[in-house]
Curated annotation (Swiss-Prot):
One of its GO terms (cellular component) is DNA-directed RNA polymerase complex. Belongs to the RNA polymerase beta' chain family. It comes from Lactobacillus johnsonii (strain CNCM I-12250 / La1 / NCC 533). Mg(2+) binds at D449, D451, D453. It comes from the Bacteria. Its EC number is 2.7.7.6. This is DNA-directed RNA polymerase subunit beta'. The RNAP catalytic core consists of 2 alpha, 1 beta, 1 beta' and 1 omega subunit. When a sigma factor is associated with the core the holoenzyme is formed, which can initiate transcription. The lineage of its organism: Bacteria, Bacillati, Bacillota, Bacilli, Lactobacillales. NCBIfam families: rpoC_TIGR (TIGR02386). Its cofactor is Mg(2+); Zn(2+). The gene is rpoC. It catalyses: RNA(n) + a ribonucleoside 5'-triphosphate = RNA(n+1) + diphosphate.
Amino acid sequence: MIDVNKFESMQIGLASPNKIRSWSYGEVKKPETINYRTLKPEKDGLFDERIFGPTKDWSCACGKYKGIRYRGIVCDRCGVEVTSAKVRRERMGHIELAAPVSHIWYFKGIPSRMGLVLDISPRALEEVIYFAAYIVIDAGDTDLEDKQLLTEAEYREKKAKFGDRFEAKMGAEAVKELLEQVDIDKEVHELKEELKTATGQKRTRAIRRLDILDAFKNSGNKPSWMVMDCIPVIPPDLRPMVQLDGGRFATSDLNDLYRRVINRNNRLKRLLDLNAPRIIVQNEKRMLQEAVDALIDNGRRGRPVVGPGNRPLKSLSHMLKGKQGRLRQNLLGKRVDYSGRSVIDVSPELKFYQCGVPRPMALELFKPFVMHELVKRGLASNIKNAKRKIDREDDDIWDILEDVIKERPVLLNRAPTLHRLGIQAFEPVLVPGKSIRLHPLACEAYNADFDGDQMAIHVPLSDEAVAESRLLMLAAHHILAPKDGKPIVTPSQDIVLGNYWLTQAERGREGEGMIFDSPAEAAIAYANGDIHYHTRIGLAADSMPEKPWPKGYEHGIFVTTYGKLVFNQIFPKDFYYINDPTQENLTHPVDERYFLQPGEDIHEKLDNMKLGQAFKKGFLSDSIAQIYKDYKVQRTSDFLDDLKELGYTVCTTSGLTIGVEDIPTISDKDDIVAEARKKVDVVSKQYRRGLITDEERHDRVISIWNNCKDIVQNEIAQIIHAPRNPITIMADSGARGNISNFTQLAGMRGLMAAPNGGMMEIPVTSNFREGLSVLEMFMSTHGARKGMTDTALKTANSGYLTRRLVDVAQDVIIREEDCGTDRGLTVHAITEGDEMIEPLFDRLVGRYTSKSVYDPETHEVICPADVLMDEDMAHKIVDAGVTEVTIRSVFTCNTQHGVCKKCYGMNLATGDDVEVGEAVGTVAAQSIGEPGTQLTMRNFHNGGVAGAADITQGLPRVQELFEARNPKGRATISEVTGEVTSIEEDPAEHTRQITVKGQTDTRTYDVPYTASVAVAEGDHVVRGDKLTLGSIDPKELIRVRDALTTEKYILSEIQKAYRMQGVEIADKHVEVMARQMLQKVRILDPGETDILPGELMDIGEFKARNREVIISGGIPATAQSVILGITKAALETNSFLSAASFQETTRVLTDASIRGKNDPLLGLKENVIIGKIIPAGTGMPVYREMEPKVDVPEDEKKKSVYSIADIEKKLAAADAEKDNGSAD
C-alpha cells in the first residue's frame, strides 16, 4: 500500500495509448455484464473476473481454488487469479478501438486545445472529426493547401483531377496524422519571431498558440495523445451493478455508456473485415466517436444520451463535477463512523466543558471500548459474548460505560458550521432520555437554540485525536471569538436578567444603612430577612484583605448593595471589588466616593448619593474579557459557570413576571398621529396643484410618518426607564427586546415594507397592545413575508460567499517566525464623513509595530518598533494623541505561500502570539463569512434625499468588492496629481467637464449631470482621488495607483459594509483576503526570460525568474499588478486539485493535464483530497519531523499537560474552601 503521507507532490498528464494498455489487466471485448440466471460475470464482458479480479475473496470463479493459502495462483480452468475481491476497485481494463477517436475535452473546451495546436478553427475541426468534410493532409504538388477543407463533392472532383498526388482524410484519424506531423520546436520558434512584429488579434492568437505549444514542449506530452486508439475501462466496483428486491438490476450509468462504445466498436470491426462501402464505415466511425464523447462528457456536444425516463446519463465528467461529484462529495466531505445526531436540550447544571449524552447513544458510540473492557474484566469470555451482552443491555454494562467515557472527549457539531467554533469538544456525561444536553453558554458559538435544533456528535478515536480534542478543542478554551477577539460566551436571557436584578439598588429597602463587618455577617442578616438584595449597606473593606483598595481606605467602610456583594463573590479573590458597571472599575479599585469619611453618617450619605447602576449584558461580557486577560482559560471557565449558576438562581427566586398591563401606554399618541395626517393632507394638496411631482410627494409622506414614529418612540423611551417595570428590566438589562420592539408594543408599528422593496404610504398607527385593524394586519403580512424570503436568500448568498472565501485563502498558513520585511502599513482611524467607522485603537490591538511610535508632544518613544501591542499599549498610544501608526501587515509580508508570525500578530482566539502552522486563511474566511447572514440583502437607498448617489451596501457590496466587479454608482477618479482648474457644464451633452491640471499633463473628465461632484475648483487632488461621489472601481485604482493603495481601499470599504451593520471584524482577516486577490502580476514585456507576454504569474515566481535572468546578465521581464476577484483567484491557484474541486472542474483538469502540472500540495484542500495529513498545526513538516526529547524530568512532564481529572480536583478543592469560608 502506498503511504500517502510520504508524497511530496502530485502530477497530472495526458495518458499515451501505451500507458493506457499498461494500466489494463485485459481487453473488454463484449458488451455483456452479468448472466441474468447465474448472476456471474460474463467472460470478456464489462465485469469479467479474469480481467478485474475475483468477486469473492480468495476464490477463483469456478471454485477449484478456495482459501487464502492459494493466494496469487491463476486458476488453470477459469483463468481467474486468487486474490482479495478488493482488487475489483483498482484493476482497470481497456477497449481497443477499431478507429482513432478524439477526446472531447481537448477538442471542445474553450479555447479548443486541438484547434490551437493545429491552427484550425474549432468549427472546421468539428466538421472533420464528425465526418462532414475532408481535410488535406499532404497537398503534394497540387494547387491545394495543407489543412484545407474539402466537401464530399470537392474531394471527388480533386481526386478525379489529381489522382493520388495528394492525400486527404476525414475523421479523428486525419486529425491524429496532422497532430503527429506538428514540429513543436519549429512552431515555437516561428511564433516567437512572429510575436516581435505582430499586433492586435494576430498577436493574441499567436500568444495563445505559443502558450499551448510551450506547454506540450515542457510537459513531455505528445499532441497526438489527444486522439485515442484505446480507452481505459474503470474498475467494476466503481461502476457497480446490484440486484434489487424485485429481481431487477440497478446499474451505474457508466455501464450503459461503455456498452454503447463496445457495441459500436465491434460493429465497426465487423464492417471493416467485410470491406463494407466507405459511407457505411464512415457512419459507424462517427457513431463510435459520439459514443466515446458521451462516455467522457455526455451532453457537451449535441443532445445528451438519455436513459429510461429521458434522464441524461451521468458520464465520467459528471462523476467529478459539482457538489455531488467525486471531489466534493467523497474526497472533501466523507461520512464518518462513530457518530450520531439528536435533538438538543439545555442543561444548566453542566460544567462549561461538559455535555450530556443520552445513555443508548453513548452505548452505541462507545461500543468497541465497552466490549474491550468487558472482556478485559472477565465479564465476557470473548468479543462475541460481549457484543451479545450489550445488545441485551445487561445491568453490568452501564458501570463500564461510565468508566470508558471518562477522559474521552466527544465533538459536538451544529450545521451550518459557519466558523471553527461550530465544532467543539466536550467531556460526555451520561443523561437519561434521548436528547443531547448542551451547556447554555455554548449556545452563542453554535448559534443554537432549543426550539428543535439538532446536533451531531463524533467520537475522536486515535490517541492523537483525543489529545488534540482535549488540548485544542475543549469548549473551555473557546472563550474568545476568532473574528474580533471579544468573548463569544456571553451570558444571555435568564442569566443576564438574574444578574441585573441582583445588582439593582433601591431607596428605603429593609435594613438600609446597616453596616457589616464581613460578607458572612451580611449573609446571615439576609437569611433572617433583615436585608434584601437591593438594600444599600455598609461593608468593612478589611473583611476582604486580598482585594486591592484605594490608597488609605484599606480599613474603611464602603457603600454597596447586598446583591452586589453576592455578585462579587464569584470573582477571583484578588480581583477588584466591582461596584460600578464601568471599564474603569474592572481595572481600578472602587471609587473613593463610596467610602465613608471619618464621622460621616451613613444614612445621610445614602440620601445624598445617586443609586448605583445595575450590571447589564455588555458589562458582563467586558468582565469575562477582563478575567480571561488576567487569569487565563481555567479560571474564566469556572467564573462562567458561577455566573450562570448565580444568574439562573436569582432569576428564579426574584419572581419577575410580565403581563399585558406591564406594557406602558402613552396618552398623546392620537394627537401625534392626527398632526401627521394634517401634514400628509397638505402634501397631497401640493401634489394635486402640480407643485410637486409624484415621487416627491411619496418621499415626503414617507418622511412625515417616519418622523411621527420617532416622536412616539422618544416618548416611549422616556417612560421605559421606570426602574421597577419587569418589561423594562428585561429590555434594559439586555436580556431580550429593544426599543423598537417596545415602540411596536406600546406606540405604533409605523410604515410597512411593500413587496416591491419600497414602503407603503399608509402607516399602521395601532400598536400590539391596542390590537391592529384587519387592513393593518393585512398590510403587515407583506413585510413579514418579505422578511422571511430575504432571510432565506441571504443565507444562501452568504454561504456561497464563505465557500469562495475559504477556497481562495485555504493555503494561507503561518509559515515562519519573521519574513524580515522592512515595509509596513500606516494605519489611522477609518471615518466616513463625520462618522467613525473603525477607531485607531481597534486597528492597533494585536499587531506588531513596524516603526517606533513617538509622543506627538514630548517626542519620546511610547512604543518601540517590533513590539506586539496589547490593549494597554494601544490605549497608551491613542491617549497620547497619536493619529497614525506604521504596523506590520499581511499586505507587506514577504513569506511565500503564507504569512509570517510578525506580520499577522496576535491570534485573536487566544489573545497570544499566533503560532507557526495556524491556518489563518481559513479562519479569516470564516470570520468574514460567518456574520454574512447579519448583513442586509438590499442595496440601500437614501430615503429619497436628492444629491447623494445610491450606493450598494450590505452583502451585495461585500461581494462586489471581493469579486472586484465594476461597482454600481461608480466614482470617476483622477489619473493625475494636481489641481482642479475648471468644472464646466455642457447642457447639450448633459454632462459636466472636470479638468485637472497636473505637473506634466492635463486631463478632462466627462461626468453625467446626475453624479455629485466631490471636488471644487482650486482643490488639490492626488491621483486616485475621487472626483465624483460613489464607489471606486478597484481595477481602475490599481492601474492609476499601486497594489498597496488598492488593498487599503478594499480593507476600509469592507470594514464600512460590516460596521454599518454593527458587525466587528478584525482588519487582519480582511487583509489576508485582499492579499490573495493581489497575488498575481501580468507580464507586459518578457525581456530575456522565457515567460510569455500577457501571462498571469505569481509575484513570488516572477521575482525569482527575474533574479535568475539578472544574475546571468540578461534583461528582466516587466509586469503590472492585477486584481482578481476571489473566484478567479481561487481558480488561478498553483494547485490544480484545489481549483478542480472548487469550480469548472473539467476546464481546470484539461488545462492541468496538457501542461503536465505538478501540484506541490501546499494548501489544505489538496491534502484532504489525497488523504494526506494537512500541513497546518501539528501537521506542518516543522512539527512532523520533531524528535521526542529524551530524559525529561518527571515534574516537567506533569507541568505541561493537565487532564480533566486535575481540573475536577482543583474544583473540589475550591468548593471545599468556599464551604469553609461560608462556615466561618
